[in-house]
């Protein structure tokens, strides 16, 4: 995992841009000027630690160059295929495999790889720069475009520091979105003219004409709209376990030490169990909280003790929160209010002392159906059929009673899962202060992923997979872990696993409405029913850590101008 950056303006400061992302790549920095474009790279050495794995990397004739952030899984098979076609390799890195795959198949190479990636390819043969982002949005990729000047970077701060001739203007609609859903939804960023390349998308920039000629999707997830049982559960369990095992074994490959995050929840327990099977010396890292209502630590400890795992742990306290709160702007260069970012940073900091790579359970809820609001909507639909108007009823009641009745707020949090949005109650005031047009509707970015004909749980899973997962969860993990130069991998988000789960009927995936029912059944004996079949807690900090009852986004909003880098 690394930091990448590039642009077409010769006056920009590429050294400053890449230096501010050194935390993403402390093992070396390189800037390369090319005709019409510049690439920069900050390296975190994971595969092929030698100089041969350094980037930017170029083809044998120097016509094509690449900078790449992420990992390609199972790339050895692709490498063998390319060697049979006559390609020679001078490193053991996956970067060189991508480069030669592009030379062989052009832009279609991206359909042949699986992994987490943000890729930029410079091609003198047609004088273009092509960007590619992984299917789920695991790796970030920002770009700036004003109609002629174009640049990209792994983080927003890279864009801002590189584009030293630009006066950046805050996008008030992004602030408005943030105040409603606690993060800035893709493709927006905090600033106008700066965007994020959407997951599963490619972009082509014409260097000569200084314009973006393509921004399109290269992958479409097929979703099963059936509700009833279609396949025998034993067959599904066998296939699921094979895919989980395969994904974890592929993602354990590295030339540096690998560990796992173990929260005690369903997903991290399964990932850690399979990682331990692959390597009994794997280190696990866990967080505990002083408030037992937020602690799952005893479940993590139980699993670690059962399999004699190497467990490392730390307690996250209120003083830790106070200490790290003001540092949040260092990790997230735009407003972000997911409070689990704090313990994620601390567990990453602890892990980095022993390993360079960790596997996490992120994505399991979206892929296998694990959020509590899914179950509520499943029950509502079974009782009453589709009940979309219920959202409006609850929303109106919350606005009237927000200071009196916290039941309505809890109800809204659950019911909002149907759309995947959690509106803040000060909407009218926010619109006024931010000068937001009356016609602007925050839900527009989600409507493109709202598929009415899908069963309730599947519908919500798909929405969250496309919005909440890349916008919040994966952003949180990437920034918190990379702040300490730790690579996080997410085996439950492999292409094969995502496509497998969404190819199932809802009943096969969540039998009788049991959240993650198939996944839990597959690991009952190894993980234990007491860990698998209990109320979901989530990975968040106690609300008592805040000074008052303001929402996290309002706490962070008071410092919003500090995000002007």
What is the role of each PLM region?
Residues 81, 162, 367-370, 500:
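Residues that scaffold the ATP/ADP-binding catalytic core of kinase and kinase-like folds
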Residues 1, 108, 167, 193-194, ...:
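Adenosyl-5′-phosphate
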Residues 335-338:
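Acceptor-substrate binding/catalytic loop of class I
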């Amino acid at each position: 995992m690394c930091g990448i950056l590039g642009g077409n303006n010769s006056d920009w400061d590429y050294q400053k841009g890449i230096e501010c992302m050194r935390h993403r790549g402390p093992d070396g920095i390189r800037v390369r000027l090319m005709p019409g474009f510049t690439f920069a790279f900050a390296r975190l050495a994971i595969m092929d630690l030698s100089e041969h794995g350094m980037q930017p990397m170029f083809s044998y004739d120097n016509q094509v160059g690449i900078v790449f952030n992420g990992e390609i899984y199972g790339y050895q098979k692709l490498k063998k295929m390319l060697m049979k076609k006559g390609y020679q390799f001078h490193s053991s890195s996956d970067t060189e495999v991508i480069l030669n795959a592009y030379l062989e198949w052009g832009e279609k190479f991206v359909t042949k790889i699986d992994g987490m990636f943000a890729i930029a390819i410079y091609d003198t043969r047609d004088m273009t720069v092509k960007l590619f982002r992984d299917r789920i949005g695991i790796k970030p990729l920002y770009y700036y475009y004003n109609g002629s000047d174009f640049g990209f970077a792994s983080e927003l701060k890279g864009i801002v520091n590189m584009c030293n001739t630009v006066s950046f203007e805050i996008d008030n609609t992004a602030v408005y979105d943030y105040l409603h859903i606690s993060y800035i939804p893709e493709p927006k960023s905090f600033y106008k003219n700066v965007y994020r390349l959407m997951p599963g998308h490619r972009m082509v920039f014409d260097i000569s004409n200084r314009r973006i000629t393509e921004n399109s999707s290269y992958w479409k997830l097929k979703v099963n709209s059936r509700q009833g049982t279609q396949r025998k559960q034993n067959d599904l369990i066998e296939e699921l376990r094979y895919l989980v095992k395969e994904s974890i074994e592929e993602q354990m490959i590295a030339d540096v030490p690998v560990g796992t995050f173990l929260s005690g929840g369903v997903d991290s327990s399964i990932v850690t169990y399979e990682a331990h099977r692959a390597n009994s010396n794997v280190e696990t890292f866990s967080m505990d909280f002083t408030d037992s209502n937020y602690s799952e630590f005893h479940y993590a400890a139980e699993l670690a003790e059962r399999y004699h795992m190497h467990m490392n742990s730390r307690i996250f306290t209120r003083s830790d929160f106070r200490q790290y709160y003001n540092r949040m702007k260092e990790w997230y260069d735009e407003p972000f209010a997911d409070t689990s970012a704090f313990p994620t940073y601390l567990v990453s900091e602890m892990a980095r002392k022993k390993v360079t790579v960790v596997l996490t359970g992120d994505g399991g809820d979206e892929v296998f159906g694990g959020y509590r609001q899914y179950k509520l909507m499943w029950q509502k639909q079974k009782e009453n059929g589709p009940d979309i108007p219920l959202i409006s009823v609850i929303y109106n009641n919350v606005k009237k009673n927000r200071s009196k009745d916290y039941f309505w707020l809890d109800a809204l949090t659950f019911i909002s899962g149907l759309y995947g949005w959690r509106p803040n109650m000060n909407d009218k005031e926010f619109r006024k202060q931010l000068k937001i047009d009356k016609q602007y509707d925050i839900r527009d970015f989600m409507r493109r992923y709202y598929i009415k004909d899908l069963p309730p749980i599947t519908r919500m899973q798909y929405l969250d997979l496309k919005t909440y997962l890349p916008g919040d969860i994966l952003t949180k993990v990437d920034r918190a872990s990379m702040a300490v130069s730790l690579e996080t991998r997410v085996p439950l988000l492999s292409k094969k696993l995502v496509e497998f789960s969404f190819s199932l009927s809802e009943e096969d995936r969540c039998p009788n409405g049991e959240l993650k029912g198939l996944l839990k059944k597959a690991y009952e004996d190894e993980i234990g029913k007491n860990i698998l079949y209990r109320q979901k807690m989530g990975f968040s900090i106690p609300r008592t850590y805040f000074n008052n009852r303001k929402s996290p986004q309002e706490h962070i909003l008071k410092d919003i101008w500090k995000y002007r880098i």
